[in-house]
């Protein structure tokens, strides 16, 4: 499988829904999944998973046909709604009074959520945000092919909201043969910058693709993060080598499995490489530091269709007076300033200003201003 894989396109705004009476209400996660299914972000999926594919993904990290897919993309409905549905019929998708699409129902089944939690998230602990969300959502899954009949009008970042076909076009226009994708749900701190620029030394372009779907409550809000990315790129990155666009999916916090998922999706957006750092898509202490890198050894680059780039934990070294990692710095822990999104968030929420070894001053200014605004509106 190469990176020029065929993109699924299931957007049809002329689709006749006038005769379809039944409807399924979508929550924000299902709504963002619907968009990514339709625009090809989740290629080769053509709909919400039926039982065969669901079981296969949960147990083997592959679809029933053998291709790699690590996160079950499911459509949960209540028992009450499920009783009114039957296989073979078309049902409308609604959210906030709008009809967004249609599903051709192929499957209605009750999943074993405990098994899903254990295999996908490696825990059944409800303190884990992914597990908590899994248990909170309804208990019956509906599988089937979808059509997106209406594009979302209220995207919070319209100029940065590009479909995979558009990002591929953009990379082509820029003449980029190799593109590295970077996934983030945090403001970019100096450790991220170091990793991104190290990767940029060996490829033509960097695709900064922050996730702006549903995240946990203590993550920094997407609008504040977007502003922080803008000032960072403006001041510290070569403009012709970086492209910023949002990833509208929800965060699953599934660690290693989500790292595979994030790589596959970035392949669909047109990336040839994908950065996997320490504890990618992790939360708390549920996953080992490099577990999200180790999981890639189960798959060949050919079947993934994208090359992962693994980076060690980086830090600021007071002796080197530079960003470094254990691969490039001989000094001991006492000389290392450890940077993390969690640490930056913590300092900011306590009203402390992160040092310049942590974050660029322009970024810090944006974050402080944004978080003050957030406190005022709460």
Swiss-Prot record:
Pathway: Sulfur metabolism; hydrogen sulfide biosynthesis; sulfite from sulfate: step 1/3
Annotated GO biological process: hydrogen sulfide biosynthetic process; sulfate assimilation
Recorded superkingdom: Bacteria
Pfam family, one: PUA_2
Keywords for the protein's UniProt record, in alphabetical order: ATP-binding, Nucleotide-binding, Nucleotidyltransferase, Transferase
An MF annotation (GO) of this entry: ATP binding
Reaction(s) catalysed (UniProt annotation): sulfate + ATP + H(+) = adenosine 5'-phosphosulfate + diphosphate
Keyword Signal attributed: no
Protein name as it appears in the record: Sulfate adenylyltransferase
Source organism phylogeny: Bacteria, Bacillati, Bacillota, Bacilli, Bacillales
Gene giving rise to this polypeptide: sat
């Amino acid at each position: 499988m190469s990176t020029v894989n065929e993109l699924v396109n299931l957007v049809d705004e002329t689709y006749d829904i006038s005769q379809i009476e039944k409807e399924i209400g979508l929550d924000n996660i299902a709504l963002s999944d619907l968009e990514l299914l339709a625009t090809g972000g989740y290629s080769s999926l053509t709909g919400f998973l039926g039982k065969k594919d669901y079981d296969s993904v949960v147990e083997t990290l592959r679809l029933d046909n053998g291709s790699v897919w690590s996160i079950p993309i499911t459509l949960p409905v209540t028992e009450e709604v499920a009783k009114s549905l039957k296989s073979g019929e078309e049902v409308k998708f609604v959210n906030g009074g709008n009809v967004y699409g249609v599903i051709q129902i192929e499957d209605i089944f009750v999943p074993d959520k405990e098994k899903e939690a254990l295999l996908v998230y490696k825990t059944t602990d409800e303190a884990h945000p992914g597990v908590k969300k899994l248990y909170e959502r309804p208990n019956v899954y509906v599988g089937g092919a979808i059509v997106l009949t209406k594009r979302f009008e209220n995207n919070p970042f319209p100029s940065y909201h590009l479909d995979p076909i558009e990002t591929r076009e953009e990379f082509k226009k820029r003449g980029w043969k190799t593109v590295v994708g970077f996934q983030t749900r945090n403001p970019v701190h100096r450790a991220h910058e170091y990793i991104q620029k190290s990767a940029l030394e060996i490829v033509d372009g960097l695709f900064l693709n922050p996730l702006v779907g549903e995240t946990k409550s203590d993550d920094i809000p997407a609008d504040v993060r977007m502003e922080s990315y803008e000032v960072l790129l403006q001041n510290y990155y070569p403009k012709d080598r970086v492209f910023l666009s949002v990833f509208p999916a929800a965060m699953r916090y599934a660690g290693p499995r989500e790292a595979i998922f994030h790589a596959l999706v970035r392949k669909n957006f047109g990336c040839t490489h994908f950065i996997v750092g320490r504890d990618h898509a992790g939360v708390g202490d549920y996953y080992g530091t490099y577990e999200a890198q180790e999981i890639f050894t189960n798959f060949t680059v050919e079947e993934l269709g994208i090359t992962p780039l693994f980076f060690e934990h980086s830090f600021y070294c007071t002796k080197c007076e530079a960003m470094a990692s254990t691969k490039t710095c001989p000094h001991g822990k006492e000389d290392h300033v450890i940077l993390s999104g969690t640490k930056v968030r913590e300092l900011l929420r306590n009203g402390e200003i992160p040092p310049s070894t942590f974050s660029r001053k322009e970024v810090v200014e944006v974050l402080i201003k944004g978080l003050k605004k957030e406190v005022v509106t709460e």
